[in-house]
From Swiss-Prot:
Keywords, ordered alphabetically: Disulfide bond, Glycoprotein, Hydrolase, Metal-binding, Metalloprotease, Protease, Pyrrolidone carboxylic acid, Secreted, Zinc
Protein name: Snake venom metalloproteinase trimerelysin-2
Glycosylated residue positions: 72
Occurrences of domain Peptidase M12B (ranges): 6-201
Pfam family, one: Reprolysin
GO cellular component: extracellular region; plasma membrane
Organism field: Protobothrops flavoviridis
Positions that bind Zn(2+): 142, 146, 152
Disulfide cysteine pairs (residue numbers): 117-196, 158-180, 160-163
Family classification: Belongs to the venom metalloproteinase (M12B) family. P-I subfamily.
EC number: 3.4.24.53
One Gene Ontology term of the molecular function aspect: metalloendopeptidase activity
Amino acid sequence: QRFPQRYIELAIVVDHGMYKKYNQNSDKIKVRVHQMVNHINEMYRPLNIAISLNRLQIWSKKDLITVKSASNVTLESFGNWRETVLLKQQNNDCAHLLTATNLNDNTIGLAYKKGMCNPKLSVGLVQDYSPNVFMVAVTMTHELGHNLGMEHDDKDKCKCEACIMSDVISDKPSKLFSDCSKNDYQTFLTKYNPQCILNAP
């Protein structure tokens, strides 16, 4: 399967709780986020998607939305904030919020399916739940996958243990997308052809 080249200009926002979690050390957070983006890039390379971090905003003074442990509420607030505030400051294709808040229902991430390029829906929420940066990167890769039209791997149809779009994260997640995920992405491209990811940054 050969995929056309696409480029995602990603904005990552770090909430105030995460800023405090890393002892208000912005440099430490920057290093962590850059490592995360490197991992995400590696996982998307087989799909011919290049991810660039085009903005990193750290909410060092206070949260600019109310971050609640109800992930769907926080995701909706963040989507509204992206549309009304962030996009007016700087263009981006997609924005993800990294939070130190413990999300409800054993959730470690949430994103709108097929949201890519939509002003309000091209967002994700990821909990910085593990000291291991790769584990958090896999979660963001998973949530970006939803933005790109991917469903969870069906246990029967997708023979892929611990692949990125598995509905539960494994202790040793793989760096691979299942064939199902690749097909979902191909379908999304064909059906919607999201324009914002066509241009190189």
